[in-house]
A protein has these predicted regions:
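Nucleotide-sugar donor-binding catalytic core of glycosyltransferases
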Residues: 1-249, 259, 267-277, 308-309, ...
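Generic, well-ordered alpha-helical scaffold segments in large soluble proteins
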Residues: 237, 299-302, 318
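Short glycine/serine-rich donor-binding loops of glycosyltransferases
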Residues: 252-253
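Conserved phosphoryl-transfer motifs of two-component systems
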Residues: 263
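Acidic, glycine-centered active-site loop in nucleotide-sugar glycosyltransferases
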Residues: 276-284
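C-terminal "capping" alpha-helix adjacent to the active site of nucleotide-linked donor transferases
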Residues: 285-307
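A short, well-ordered alpha-helix in the C-terminal region of glycosyltransferases
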Residues: 309-322
Length: 347
């Protein structure tokens, strides 16, 4: 049991979309399964954990950083662990020894107290496709799918650069608050990698290129059709190509996992969830930017047929566990009770 303290005055309907995800489960959804592992306290003194109630970017946007730092410093003075949550593609890092929950970032710049969260998803088999999970047998040639924004036009490169300059100018004048990241032309680089795979005669590809996010859909019917196309592509291919988006993480990675497929992940200095407590190499194919084709093909050649099928089953089970907010925070509870625990025992 973890006893935690938070400022409950922030847990109001208006803050529903910016609340710390664990607190959303407890205080908004009244999740009794979570309460068996986390118990709220009325004072810092009786707690062993202090949670900042809202996304910390909120305090910067509302110019209430002073409250944020005072709240954190009071907890640290009393030798309490502190959890903070930062949303957005980039997130923000505080100069305090706190545990930061975020969706992505750069492995080379993150400390041991940075906890990368997965994307929390509904099961696409139930909510989108109305299908059951099926294993795809291994074939001689690897087959990989992708549906998404990828554009090789030079105008796209320059447009992304202008967006990047504008975003960083807003950070400079403190109109926006987030960590800095170097320029990375996402659509342009995705297109380049996908084309290299398409041109390789030893790889079978099933790619659908979008010039805009979700193909620029405007109506709910178009959105529904676009969503079905996206998940059908993952369903039909044993491998899914996963590359970072606006932030240094891939939602598609978790979507492939929860569907029981094998993500081929371009390692752009990423950190995956539970990186200290589980071996991601048994769940995905991590490839380098410079040698991704050979690394992918070598994995497929060396992968035994039974292991290939077992990997899909285990990924499905893993995705259902970690992409669910309730079960994710139960796993986090186990880690904070025993930092050296091996999470494989829970899957």
């Amino acid at each position: 049991m973890i006893n935690y303290y938070t400022d409950k005055s922030f847990l109001i309907p208006e803050n529903r979309k910016r609340v710390f995800p664990l607190l959303f489960q407890i205080h908004y959804l009244k999740n009794e399964n979570i309460v068996a592992f986390y118990q709220v306290q009325n004072s810092i003194e009786t707690a062993n954990l202090v949670i900042v109630p809202l996304d910390i970017i909120y305090f910067f946007n509302t110019k209430t950083q002073k409250w944020l730092y005072n709240f954190i410093d009071e907890a640290l003075k009393k030798d309490k662990k502190v959890w903070v949550y930062t949303s957005d593609d980039l997130g923000i890092t505080l100069n305090r020894p706190v545990y930061t929950f975020r969706f992505g970032g750069f492995e080379s710049k993150m400390n041991d107290k940075t906890i990368v969260m997965p994307s929390f998803l509904e099961d696409p088999y139930i909510h989108v496709l109305n299908k059951k999970f099926e294993i795809i047998p291994k074939l001689l040639m690897p087959k990989i799918g992708f549906v998404g924004q990828a554009n090789g036009a030079l105008i796209t490169y320059f447009r992304e650069f202008l967006i990047y300059l504008n975003y960083n100018f807003k950070i400079l004048i403190k109109k926006h608050h987030s960590d800095y990241q170097p320029f990375y032309p996402i659509g342009f680089r995705r297109f380049s990698k996908l084309k290299k795979m398409e041109n390789d005669t030893e790889i079978e590809t099933d790619f659908i290129y979008r010039k805009k996010y979700r193909d620029g859909v405007k109506t709910s019917l178009q959105r529904q059709k676009s969503t079905v196309t996206f998940f059908e592509n993952i369903f039909n291919n044993p491998y899914t190509f996963c590359m970072r988006g606006g932030g240094n993480f891939s939602v598609r990675f978790y979507e492939a996992l929860i569907m029981g497929r094998i993500p081929v992940v371009l390692n752009t200095d990423i950190r995956l969830p539970f990186y200290k407590n589980m071996d991601w190499n048994i769940h995905c194919v991590l490839v380098s930017e410079n040698n991704f084709l050979d690394e992918f093909k070598n994995f497929h050649k060396q992968c035994a047929d039974l292991y290939f099928e077992k990997m899909q089953v285990e990924n499905r089970n893993l995705g259902l566990k970690i992409c669910n907010s309730e079960s994710y925070f139960i796993l986090i509870h186990h880690i904070f009770e025993d930092f050296n625990c091996n999470l494989n025992q829970f899957f």
